[in-house]
Amino acid sequence: MRTTSFFLLTILCLALTASAQIYSEGPIDGNNNAFFVTGPAFPNFLGSVQDISNGFVAANSGSPGGLEWGEWSVGAPTSFSYELGSAAFGNDIGSATVGQNAFNSVFLFTNGFGYGVYDVAVPISSSVMTAGSTYWLSISNATDAANDGTQGWDIPNGGSGGPAICNVRQSGTNFGACIEDGVILGGESFTISNSIPPYTPEPSSILLFGSGILGLAGILRRKLNIQV
């Protein structure tokens, strides 16, 4: 009876963990590519003013309590803005500017391009999301103490992106799909959950730290990306 009860308890705990995740675009890559997200408040170091919005279909219903995303930055990041909306770059569901520190923006490793890769996990507030409905998450106005314009949103899956739709905005104008070398890229690294950080990292995120360190030994293919 004890064995059976323990088994049932384990299943229930797993179910609760899964239901807490409203949507996940995949674990942080950190080694291949990222999109600048310093705009519209700040230019990146190449002089353009760019931010990114990802359209996704909610896997579960719930009130978002936490946002986790992968950030590239030469200096330790100090703040960013998020917007949640029913359309690209919209904020009708929720938005805020978030201060960053060593607790909510955990340094993972320095990649082969010289960027620090950070696991950012912060509490958020928005209206209830419904499973099967489409929403948009935008990351904007990312910066660090030096305001060096190096902040980017990590692109997972070897730099090809996940299943979400990626839109790019330049100087306040949405140019639509995120394209590199004629290839349309998918969404960036992020997870939206019911949980309020800090929460236990997923096993894939823990494994990533080790794989990222090993990745420094190879020659990486891409660097921080700007749409032109």
Which ranges hold each PLM region?
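C-terminal membrane-anchoring or membrane-association module
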Residues: A217-V228
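Extended extracellular/luminal ectodomain segments enriched in beta-structured repeat modules
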Residues: A58-G66, P77
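Boundary/junction segments of secreted and surface-exposed precursor proteins
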Residues: S19-P40
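Aromatic- and Gly/Pro-enriched, solvent-exposed loop/edge beta-strand patches characteristic
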Residues: S73-A164, V168-Q170
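PGST-rich, cysteine-poor low-complexity/disordered linker and tail segments that act as flexible spacers
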Residues: Y23, N33, I52-N54, G75-A76, ...
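Short, threonine-centered small-residue motifs that mark membrane-proximal processing/anchoring sites
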Residues: M1-S24, F190-S211
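Extracellular beta-rich ligand/substrate-recognition surface
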Residues: V37-Q50, T110-Y115
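Short beta-strands within extracellular/lumenal beta-sheet-rich domains
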Residues: L46-V57, V120
